[in-house]
Design a protein with these regions (language model features):
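A short alpha/beta connector and helix-capping loop motif
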Residues: 134-159, 168-170
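Positively charged n-region of N-terminal signal peptides that target proteins for export
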Residues: 1-4
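Hydrophobic single-pass membrane-insertion segments
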Residues: 17-28
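Generic enzyme active-site microenvironment
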Residues: 124, 171, 198
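Substrate-binding clefts and substrate-entry loops adjacent to catalytic sites
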Residues: 198-209
């Protein structure tokens, strides 16, 4: 543990040095004209904020991370369907248990901020159905986000509980989210709101029943569709349709078809347990487990995660890896 504290101090020092040496940012607003004869107005520098991070006694950045799997969000709970009411309650429950929403790739790339003492949770949505993101029209014919769709519910929860954060990874198929007149606008809107777009392939095939070339073609078709709405968007993650991987898993990771290449970093399974932390020796980005969001599985796994040394708890500092001594052997060895 000590060497990490030393490392932390070095890093903080290095960051401070870097920040001080950073060239001044381009001014966002033009410099106001100063009438001749009058001395220019000099704005004082803002006071340096150097608040130390709070020490999180139980920080555990080798702990497990729940990646929840949602499908349809609709009025009635059912198979592959979470009710609107239950989805709202899930967000409240996650907030109260100390979780903060993160996008899958942001978190696993080490780019997501999780406040000190809180735990990351990834919400994933498969099949890009209308209940996940729906527009309604007001009396004047203006579009607005349906407050009962997943995106609307996430926005509302974030407004209530800012520490819950606003994130979610949506695994898209062809013709996403119904309302064919708005699909491009919706994808762009989601990216603007900070959500992540993932691939679930264009036509949702069984990967074990088609050729490798057909797999690549289907993946590229979905990617080209996303690019129509959000040019050049890098899709980082693919959720395996039906949870079935190609015989050679790497076929779904990277490749090209018709001169268009794709490059995924993460493959998502269907089921069945909390995922390993990014720095855990057992983290396998090409086979990431997810927990189906049902009453039974959610309460079972969230209760399990509250057990000793189980769940990921952030130290609040993305530059330092903090974990209990007992887990020393579980750290991923970097070559
Ligand atoms: Zn699916």
């Amino acid at each position: 543990m000590k060497k990490y504290i030393v490392l932390a101090l070095c890093l903080m020092l290095a960051i401070t040095v870097v920040m001080h040496n950073r060239p001044p940012q381009e001014a966002a607003t033009p410099t106001p004209e100063v009438p001749s004869g009058e001395p220019p107005v000099v704005m004082p520098d803002p006071p340096e904020v150097n608040e130390p991070l709070p020490v999180v006694e139980n920080a555990n950045e080798l702990g497990r991370v729940p990646i929840l799997m949602y499908h349809r969000i609709v009025a009635e709970e059912g198979e592959w369907a979470r009710s609107i009411e239950n989805f709202r309650n899930d967000l409240k429950n996650l907030y109260e248990r100390g979780y903060t929403l993160v996008n899958l790739s942001d978190f696993y790339d080490g780019k997501a901020q999780v406040p000190p003492g809180r735990s990351p949770v990834v919400l994933t949505f498969d099949d890009s159905t209308r209940g996940q993101f729906n527009y309604l029209l007001d009396a004047a014919g203006e579009k607005y986000i349906d407050p009962d769709c997943a995106v609307g519910i996430l926005l509302d929860a974030y407004a209530r509980w800012p520490e819950l954060g606003l994130a979610g990874t949506f695994f898209l198929n062809g013709n996403p989210f119904g309302q064919s007149e708005y699909w491009q606008e919706k994808l762009k809107h989601m990216v603007d709101l900070g959500f992540e777009l993932g691939s679930h392939t264009f036509s949702h095939p069984f990967f074990n029943r088609i050729t490798d070339e057909e797999i690549r073609a289907d993946i590229v078709k979905l990617q080209l569709q996303v690019w129509q709405a959000v040019p050049g968007y890098h899709i980082r993650a693919l959720a395996l349709p039906y949870g079935i991987a190609p015989r050679d898993r790497t076929v779904a990771v990277s490749g090209s078809h018709d001169g268009v290449s794709f490059n995924h970093s993460y493959l998502m399974e269907v089921g069945a347990e909390p995922a390993f932390a990014p720095d855990h020796v057992r983290h396998n980005p090409l086979s990431m487990p997810r927990i189906a969001a049902t009453d039974e599985l959610l309460s079972r796994w969230l209760d399990w995660l509250d057990g000793p040394l189980r769940r990921y708890i952030s130290d609040g500092n993305p530059d330092v890896l903090t974990y209990p001594d007992e887990l020393q052997e579980q750290i991923k060895k970097t070559p």
